[in-house]
């Protein structure tokens, strides 16, 4: 029962992380306009995401535009787009494997095969979490580096957007859920064989006497 509860908790955390990755991918808030002291860098708030950028006027009006080309993105956001999409696909595979190997499903009859499938699902979730945390941390590092770089113009300085925090939370959920699923140990099947072997030895010894 405890093993099933651990498994359900791991699947739930991983699914929440998977949904958070999709939210991180969709939100155009990887980079936002920076505020330096009490002065606003520009009269507009600029949001930059993986798929579009949005400009929010001081009046509250917002306009979003999809990137015309992949080359319009900075290098870190190009890599982030690829890794986040791969992470979503890999996590979807992990969800499928966790359903197949779940204790409360009948997709597999063998308990050992179920446990092994669940371990594979946990490893897949761990990989998905790593694929998210790498681009999010890379983008955050570049933002901080440019913010304190005196050679970068004030209008080009950005701050970390909400998508980065969502990405960190998503990677944490995926890593935690995958770690819990990897704790599913397959049942041992060598006990019956050892019992039969010992019984056969005792029978042979009695016949010899």
From Swiss-Prot:
InterPro entries: Claudin, Claudin4, Claudin_CS, PMP22/EMP/MP20/Claudin
Residue spans, topological domain Extracellular: 29-81, 139-160
Region entry Interaction with EPHA2, spans: 1-103
Role: Can associate with other claudins to regulate tight junction structural and functional strand dynamics. May coassemble with CLDN8 into tight junction strands containing anion-selective channels that convey paracellular chloride permeability in renal collecting ducts. May integrate into CLDN3 strands to modulate localized tight junction barrier properties. May disrupt strand assembly of channel-forming CLDN2 and CLDN15 and inhibit cation conductance. Cannot form tight junction strands on its own.
GO biological process: bicellular tight junction assembly; calcium-independent cell-cell adhesion via plasma membrane cell-adhesion molecules; cell adhesion; circadian rhythm; establishment of skin barrier; female pregnancy; paracellular transport; positive regulation of cell migration
Catalytic activity: chloride(in) = chloride(out); bromide(in) = bromide(out); iodide(out) = iodide(in); fluoride(in) = fluoride(out)
GO CC terms: apical plasma membrane; apicolateral plasma membrane; basal plasma membrane; bicellular tight junction; cell-cell junction; chloride channel complex; lateral plasma membrane; plasma membrane
Topology within the bilayer: Multi-pass membrane protein
Annotated region described as Interactions with TJP1, TJP2 and TJP3, given as residue ranges: 208-209
Highest taxon listed in the record's lineage: Eukaryota
UniProt-reported outcome of changing residue 40 to A: No effect on interaction with Clostridium perfringens CPE
Record's comment on post-translational modification: Phosphorylated. Phosphorylation by EPHA2 is stimulated by EFNA1 and alters interaction with TJP1.
UniProt disease annotation: CLDN4 is located in the Williams-Beuren syndrome (WBS) critical region. WBS results from a hemizygous deletion of several genes on chromosome 7q11.23, thought to arise as a consequence of unequal crossing over between highly homologous low-copy repeat sequences flanking the deleted region.
Modified residues (Phosphotyrosine): 208
Organism: Homo sapiens
Family statement drawn from the similarity comment of this UniProt entry: Belongs to the claudin family.
Protein name: Claudin-4
Keyword terms, alphabetized: Cell junction, Cell membrane, Chloride, Chloride channel, Disulfide bond, Ion channel, Ion transport, Membrane, Phosphoprotein, Tight junction, Transmembrane, Transmembrane helix, Transport, Williams-Beuren syndrome
Residues annotated as transmembrane: 8-28, 82-102, 118-138, 161-181
Pfam families xref list: PMP22_Claudin
Cytoplasmic side, ranges: 1-7, 103-117, 182-209
Compartment annotation: Cell junction, Tight junction; Cell membrane
GO terms assigned for molecular function: chloride channel activity; identical protein binding; structural molecule activity; transmembrane signaling receptor activity
Positions of disulphide bridges: 54-64
Effect of substituting residue 35 to A: Decreases interaction with Clostridium perfringens CPE
Assembly mode: Can form heteropolymeric strands with other claudins. Interacts with CLDN8. Interacts with CLDN1. Directly interacts with TJP1/ZO-1. Interacts with TJP2/ZO-2 and TJP3/ZO-3. Interacts with EPHA2; phosphorylates CLDN4 and may regulate tight junctions.
